[in-house]
Amino acid sequence: MSLQSIKYSRGSLEILDQLLLPGQSKYEVVRGVEDGWKVINKMQVRGAPAIAIVGCLSLAVEINPEDFETKKSLRQEVEGKLNYLVSARPTAVNMKIAADELITLANDLYKDEAIDVNGMKQRFLDATEAMLKKDIADNRAIGANGAKAILQRVAEKGGAPAGSTGSVRVLTHCNTGSLATAGYGTALGVVRQLAELGKLEHVYCTETRPYNQGARLTAYELVHEKFPATLVLDSMVAALLRAKNVAAVVVGADRVASNGDTANKIGTYQIAVVAKHHDVPFYVAAPLTSIDLAIPGGDHIIIEERPDREMTHVGEHRIAAPGINCWNPAFDVTPASLITGIITERGVFKPAELKEAITKLLES
């Protein structure tokens, strides 16, 4: 059974505090937007889909008990607080897309004279809660599409890697499972689907320095699921791909530009370079809400920079020399030329065909 990172019922929201994992499983109560902003910014909850879900649900929890005198006051509160939530972690596009969608809904409901203020609030709450259910369904579709693509690619290359039992070995980076989404996962959802099909021989996960999401979170999920899994250091990826017959790399995304350039957790770019050298397919698994057609390329993606302390300390223990300068970008951008395919809930697309394909899907 998948881990539950988000617990929600109308008027109540709790998130599994991921800063405490794997040592302690503790749920943090989110009472409203200010709490939502803090748990996102502090990375108590992380992963682009989960950020959007928790951000929107924190607003739902806040407005649920409120009585609004006018539709205008409700619309203003929705717009102002959603824009504030976007600022918590700006690189992940999912929160921005979800905010824009809900603001558009609020404006449409405001203009609809047949709906009163209570009806407007109810419709808004329903739409927010629907995002939670949709994310889980989308994750499952991503998993199915990704597993199919990887197995088909292996078959085209002449079968599973030498020495395997017909199943595949895959590498993933950072954390993209139930802890990063509403449930099931994106890239880890692909791994999960391979396991459900009986086609997962082994999964390797990187430690993902400096925040160690791979070691703390992905390894935690893999052990929980009892998948055959091995943790490797970020610096071992080249040796791993040379020695272990890895069939594919599959990672998540915080933002995908219209040309396929992909911003993901720092370290993703170098894995893609190494995968290209070793002729290992490199897949990005992401929902359509992670694709930003308004951005032509990766150079336009804002990269969040994190505090030096995340590099210089482990807990309260300093591991770097005092006085050393640090550069700590949370993400890097993998060029589309290094990406084999982008796995979405609506199919797997080559980066070159992404913009046209997604535009047609959105129009339909």
UniProtKB/Swiss-Prot annotation:
It comes from the Eukaryota. Its EC number is 5.3.1.23. GO terms for cellular component: cytoplasm; nucleus. The keyword Zinc does not apply. The active site is at residue 254. Belongs to the eIF-2B alpha/beta/delta subunits family. MtnA subfamily. Catalyzes the interconversion of methylthioribose-1-phosphate (MTR-1-P) into methylthioribulose-1-phosphate (MTRu-1-P). This is Methylthioribose-1-phosphate isomerase. The lineage of its organism: Eukaryota, Metazoa, Ecdysozoa, Arthropoda, Hexapoda.
